[in-house]
Amino acid sequence: MPKVKRSNADIVLRLYVAGSAPNSLSAMANAKGICDTHFPARHKLEIVDMLQDPMRALADGIIVTPTLLRLLPLPVRRVIGNLSDTAQVLLTLEGK
């Protein structure tokens, strides 16, 4: 299970990307937009470049990028892809 540092945020997310690949850039922009719009002032978004930190990605079980992990609240949830389908991303993140 991914390690999570203590946070005051209601929702803690970690986005794994692969450098400046087009889908990674889209996922970063989409994740930031979703967080700012739907979870303002109550989220923590960490972006991890799998090319720079492959062992961390491996430890979290990441084999495909982009992958967004919702670390808190538990249970951990995953969304794979560029996060362009906001409704589906929100359904997964909110556990519905």
Question: Which residues make up each language-model segment?
Answer:
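Short beta-strand/turn micro-motifs at beta-sheet edges
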Residues: 1-4
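A short, hydrophobic beta-strand/beta-hairpin element that forms part of a small beta-sheet core
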Residues: 65-77
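Thioredoxin-like thiol-disulfide oxidoreductase module
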Residues: 48-64, 95
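Ser/Thr/Gly-rich flexible loops in soluble cytosolic domains mediating phosphotransfer, phosphorylation
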Residues: 83-96
